[in-house]
Amino acid sequence: MNNSLESTKQLLDVVKFDSNGLVPAIVQDVESGKVLMMAWMNRESLAMTLEKKVACYWSRSRKELWLKGETSGNMQQVHDVLIDCDGDTLLLKVSQKGGACHVGYHSCFYRKATENGSLEICDTLMFNPEEVYGKKS
């Protein structure tokens, strides 16, 4: 992944951020192709991701930058950042350390709808979120 300042500025100029200054980012395992999660990025988090090659997102609920894995240790090393044809969605190809999902699964897409409409777990639990983040009160 090229991280020159000119390349970063070029990408930031092409991305179509929404009215809140955000763009959706789909995150995919670089080896398996498995979709791990979807998160939001703003200009600052995208620039930081390109610079450090570690995924950084924007938390809409906390209204702050969110370095993926900062609390849990489940970091995402970024190999590639792709942009879709409309310029309004990103795809990050990453090496995921541990689970990507905050509830402990490898992927945030850990539930599958069955024919009868129920949900079944279809992924691996990687960690206990209470041990990593503490109990919610």
Swiss-Prot record:
Molecular function (GO) terms for this protein are:
magnesium ion binding; phosphoribosyl-AMP cyclohydrolase activity; zinc ion binding
Q: Name one GO cellular component term.
A: cytoplasm
* Keyword terms: Amino-acid biosynthesis, Cytoplasm, Histidine biosynthesis, Hydrolase, Magnesium, Metal-binding, Zinc
Q: Where does Mg(2+) bind?
A: 84, 86, 88
An example of a Gene Ontology BP annotation on this entry? Answer: L-histidine biosynthetic process
Q: Name one Pfam family in it.
A: PRA-CH
Question: Zinc among the record's keywords?
Answer: yes
Binding-site list for Zn(2+): 85, 101, 108
Family membership: Belongs to the PRA-CH family.
Q: What protein am I looking at?
A: Phosphoribosyl-AMP cyclohydrolase
Q: Source taxonomy lineage? A: Bacteria, Pseudomonadati, Chlorobiota, Chlorobiia, Chlorobiales
